[in-house]
Amino acid sequence: WDELMQLEYLMNKFGDRDLEVYLIHAAEWNVMGHKRMTERSVVLTASESGTTPEVLEAVKKMKEKGIRVYAMTKPEGPIGQAVGAENCVAMASDHGSGGCEKGYYLADCFGLRLLNRRGCFPKFDLFIEQTKDVWKDMLDIRKRFEPRAEELARKYALADYTMFIGSGALWGETILYSMCLLEEMQWKRIRHITSHDFFHGTLELLEPGVPVFLFMGEDECRALDERVRAFLTSGVTGDEDYVIIDTAEYAIPGLDDDFRVIVSPWILSVLTTDRLARNYELVTKHNLKYRRYYHQFDY
């Protein structure tokens, strides 16, 4: 769900005015449906385990309605079997083990290719060419960020409560890291909020000793992030525990300017879902694979 938010953003950014793109939660679709979904619709879903019950139920219903469904999942899993192996591509990574940027890459290639076929993203071939060797750059970014990841983990991994702020193309990754990695895998108490919503109540929760992470991207919403940064650095709250992570500081050389916004969630994933989470794990001594309830029994 949160991993596909950036794709919804990109398809709306680069698509034409007649293109309809919706990000729908499978559990909600199972009980509410969606009036704009027809047999002419194309659906992309994802399941790391291949068994997510809400997704499996939704996929089966969609197939019965004649809707075209593609999945990033194990072809041999229940969801893969429901979709059909020919419409599946195996997930290239899993949360907590690094490499989530590869999942972004696969989803982006799918969505941007659809746009290209509509005449909306003419630079698709250039995008593929310029990102084919991006994985070395991602490794370099990991190495460059590692000392800071170690420092941040030592300082904040044991905090009672932490706030995360993001926007635009980075909002999905902001949720993924704070909820899936820190809440689910580290059992940390977290608040995630968009840069535009931050000033509608959440700002009142800032006080000395509350760590605040601001993730800054390279899209139109950067102006909203800048407003948050100005507030955090003003000193008015007395809270000096703010962290600003700006994907522009880790820009990949040789990329067309139009592609920087596309790869910004990949970069943030490398920094947070991979390296920062791993360093939190070392400090908390809490294995990222520990679960009390998730996948432990039916609920």
For each of these PLM feature ranges, what is it?
Residues 1-39, 157-200:
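Anionic-ligand anchoring segments at beta-strand to alpha-helix junctions in alpha/beta enzyme folds, i.e.
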Residues 1-124, 130, 215-242:
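Glycine-rich phosphate-binding loops that contact phosphosugars or nucleotide phosphates
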Residues 23-25, 73-74, 189-197, 239-251:
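A generic structural motif
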Residues 42-46, 161-168, 211-215:
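Short glycine-rich or small-residue beta-strand-to-loop segments that form or flank ligand, phosphate
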Residues 76-88, 201-205, 250-260:
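Glycine-rich, charge-decorated loop segments at or immediately adjacent to ligand/cofactor-binding or catalytic sites
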Residues 95-96, 112-195, 288-299:
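Active-site phosphate/pyrophosphate-binding segments
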Residues 172-242:
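Internal helical hairpin/lid segments
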Residues 228-299:
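Phosphate-moiety recognition in structured ligand-binding domains
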